[in-house]
């Protein structure tokens, strides 16, 4: 008998599942017989419990298990027979009217939608390009020098000088101070510290502290007012004005290493050759620029695909992705050391919009890949792994690391598929190239 699939909406369907009671009962009896061989009950040796007693105690549980298994099997059979592309998990409910000699259930579920992708020639994408020159290399070297800064006591002669004749604290100096804060001449909790270090100009301290410390010499003090906002977390001082006195204990000036052979060696250039060092920095910057431009243009391509595509999104898939995002959020909290992160009450509704976009995009990409043969080829995957491995000291070990784990390899395969999609769309869309600086590129990719 043909199965009747009811259309309940754009994607929602319903089908009736009928299970002969005698078939179900035979399976229940068989399982109880098997259970009787292992079940333990007081007063009986294992395997010697009468089947009738086992049935009395476990019949309900076994019946539920058998029905669940049989319903699932029958639904799978119907799905294949009717060529149903089921999205998510179906829900099963007993029918109000049961046929004689059979169990009847309604299976309600969603199917995958038809995906209509519009004309790719109408898609618009802005592609950023950037050039790496001496200015970008010099800027990177400046950052690397600052990462290797050494501080020396200002005014004391040393290997690198004394920091100049002016011994007052300047921006860039690391200072060590004592400070005392009072409200109405009474010290308050948290308002006092000794030997407190910070670097002037980094912005870690309140502006009032920075201003007070600037220009002081060792042993000098300065008093200033600090008004706490009404919503300050410390209730005892919220909305009040405190008088702070800061006393300079130590001033250390920053010494940046010279860009010489030793500096090059510290960056991994064994012979200290400065030309090689600049060449490697340029290669690294070009790889980073390529990665950032690819990421930005990929996001633009995905946005363009969503704009020209028409499809209904199965609610079941959105709900599944919401739960995945909730679990990812909990894992992130756990990695940050948040207590009881795995049980954090994170509402799935927070991720509704994000989940809908992810699911919709996944369906569009799957259709585009299938229709245009954009699957990842083994040689493409290997080429990407090799490219990624170049930035590590032992590329061969990185390659082995990828190919030793199917999940890592699957992630790289997904990346290649996305790259194939991006290249395919760029070959057909309206693409505008825009030259941007490396700094602007870094800022744009951080916001993407």
Swiss-Prot record:
Keywords: Cell cycle, Cell division, Chaperone, Cytoplasm, Isomerase, Rotamase. GO terms for molecular function: peptidyl-prolyl cis-trans isomerase activity; protein folding chaperone; ribosome binding. It catalyses: [protein]-peptidylproline (omega=180) = [protein]-peptidylproline (omega=0). Its EC number is 5.2.1.8. One of its GO terms (biological process) is chaperone-mediated protein folding. It is an enzyme of class 5 (isomerase). SUPFAM superfamilies: FKBP-like, Triger factor/SurA peptide-binding domain-like, Trigger factor ribosome-binding domain. HAMAP family: Trigger_factor_Tig. Belongs to the FKBP-type PPIase family. Tig subfamily. This is Trigger factor.
């Amino acid at each position: 008998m043909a199965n009747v699939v009811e259309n309940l909406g754009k994607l929602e369907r319903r089908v009736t599942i009928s299970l002969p009671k005698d078939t179900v009962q035979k399976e229940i009896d068989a399982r109880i017989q098997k259970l009787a061989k292992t079940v333990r009950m007081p007063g009986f040796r294992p395997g010697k419990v009468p089947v009738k007693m086992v049935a009395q105690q476990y019949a309900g549980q076994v019946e539920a298990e058998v029905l669940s298994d049989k319903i699932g099997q029958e639904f799978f059979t119907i799905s294949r027979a009717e060529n149903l592309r089921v999205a998510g998990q179906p829900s099963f409910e007993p029918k109000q009217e049961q046929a004689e000699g059979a169990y009847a259930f309604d299976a309600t579920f969603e199917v995958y939608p038809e995906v209509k992708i519009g004309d790719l020639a109408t898609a618009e994408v802005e592609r950023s390009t950037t050039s790496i020159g001496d200015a970008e290399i010099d800027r990177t070297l400046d950052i690397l020098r600052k990462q290797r800064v050494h501080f020396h006591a200002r005014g004391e002669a040393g290997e690198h000088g004394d920091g100049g004749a002016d011994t007052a604290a300047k921006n860039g100096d690391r200072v060590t101070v004592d400070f005392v804060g009072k409200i109405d001449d009474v010290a308050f909790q948290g308002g006092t510290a000794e030997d407190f270090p910070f670097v002037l100009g980094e912005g870690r301290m309140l502006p009032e502290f920075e201003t007070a410390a600037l220009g002081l010499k060792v042993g000098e003090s300065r008093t200033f007012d600090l008004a706490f906002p009404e919503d300050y977390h410390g209730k005892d001082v919220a909305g009040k004005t405190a008088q702070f006195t800061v006393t300079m204990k130590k001033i250390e000036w920053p010494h940046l290493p010279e860009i010489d052979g030793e500096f090059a060696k510290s960056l991994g250039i064994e012979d200290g050759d400065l030309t090689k060092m600049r060449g490697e920095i340029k290669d690294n910057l070009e790889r980073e620029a390529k990665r950032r431009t690819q990421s930005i243009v990929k996001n633009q391509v995905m946005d363009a695909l969503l704009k020209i595509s028409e499809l209904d999104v199965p609610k079941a898939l959105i709900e599944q992705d919401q739960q995945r995002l909730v679990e990812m959020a909990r894992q992130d909290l756990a990695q940050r050391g948040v207590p009881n992160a795995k049980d954090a009450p994170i509402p799935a509704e927070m991720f509704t919009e994000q989940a809908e976009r992810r699911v919709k995009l996944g369906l569009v990409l799957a259709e585009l890949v299938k229709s245009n043969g954009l699957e990842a080829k083994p040689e493409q995957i290997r080429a990407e792994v090799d490219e990624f491995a170049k930035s590590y000291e032992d590329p061969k070990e990185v390659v082995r690391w990828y190919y030793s784990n199917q999940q890592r390899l699957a992630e790289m395969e997904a990346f290649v598929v996305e790259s194939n999609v991006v290249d395919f769309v760029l070959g057909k869309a309206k693409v505008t190239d825009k030259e941007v600086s490396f700094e602007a590129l870094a800022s744009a990719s951080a916001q993407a």
